[in-house]
A protein has these predicted regions:
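Conserved glycine-rich cofactor-binding loop
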Residues: 6-8
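Conserved glycine-rich Rossmann-like NAD(P)H-binding loop of the short-chain dehydrogenase/reductase
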Residues: 22-36
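Substrate-binding pocket helix/loop in short-chain dehydrogenase/reductase
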Residues: 85-86, 90-98, 198
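Active-site helix of classical SDR
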Residues: 109, 150, 158
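Residue(s) in the substrate-gating loop at a strand-loop-helix junction
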Residues: 134
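Short C-terminal tail/terminal secondary-structure segment
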Residues: 139, 204, 218, 229-242
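Short, small/polar-rich loop/turn modules that mediate ligand/substrate recognition or access, typified
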Residues: 166-171, 228-230
Length: 242
């Protein structure tokens, strides 16, 4: 199951997982976006099922989850950012971002975990929960205080979950990308001064592509990472190494 699957990283992760053989359940608020992703997945001979859903609506997500017979992998991806200087953060923006990036991430993970645990052979087959975090869950950045707070919270959530869900053989990790060339980041990079400053902070000298992150997610979803839990896979071109 991939949340926020209509665009950007969620779309790329859904396609990568389908290519790897997963039966992908894709969620987004926008049906037209889901239709486009489903079409791409069909072209790769993959399998998908889509649901229109706002993950900030607890009961709505809960109802959709009841329609899903089996769940082995969660990519907890839905999120957003509204850059503002800390002293000028609007209350409505702080509440919107925290509801989506933290509260909804918690609720989705909790409900999915409960469903995964109920599988009779869970300890044998295992499971994987991957939170889409950020390098900004590791380091600070100007104009991103609320996002910093949210993603540091997601990092803590993942570690606590990893300890508690290990007894069910459910692994929990995060993927922490640098700035990725998604529709959202392209809007930020219209500010050339900001873009150039960000590029100077990436030793590899480029922003990440969606595929860079999607392949990291696919790795953490696969059996090849079966001994990896409670950690972060940082896809940042060296930013946080400095």
């Amino acid at each position: 199951l991939v949340t926020g699957a209509g665009k950007g990283l969620g779309k790329a992760c859904s396609i990568a997982l389908a290519e790897a053989g997963a039966k992908v359940i894709i969620l987004s608020r926008t049906k037209s976006d889901l239709d486009k992703v489903s079409k791409i997945i069909r072209k790769t001979k993959g399998s998908s099922k889509s649901f229109v859903c706002d993950v900030t609506q607890f009961e709505e997500f809960k109802r959709i989850l009841q329609k899903i017979k089996r769940l082995d992998i969660l990519v907890n991806n839905a999120g957003n950012n509204r850059p503002e200087h800390f002293t000028k953060v609007k209350r409505e923006n702080m509440e919107y971002l925290t509801n989506l990036n933290m509260k909804a991430a918690f609720n989705v993970a909790q409900l999915c975990s409960q469903k995964m645990i109920k599988a009779k052979n869970r300890k044998k087959i295992g499971g994987s929960i991957i939170h889409m975090s950020s390098q900004l869950g590791k380091v600070g950045c100007e104009g991103r205080n609320v996002y910093n707070m949210n993603k540091f919270g997601v990092e803590g959530l993942a570690r606590g979950m990893a300890v508690e869900l290990a007894e069910y053989n459910i692994r929990v990790n995060t993927v922490c990308p640098t700035f990725v060339e998604t529709p959202m980041v392209k809007q930020f990079f219209k500010n050339k001064k900001f873009k150039n400053k960000m590029l100077r902070n990436i030793p590899l000298g480029r922003v990440a592509q969606e595929r860079d992150v999607a392949t990291a997610v696919a790795f953490l979803a696969a059996d090849s990472s079966e001994m990896i839990t409670g950690t972060s896979l940082v896809v940042d071109g060296g930013w946080t190494a400095q």
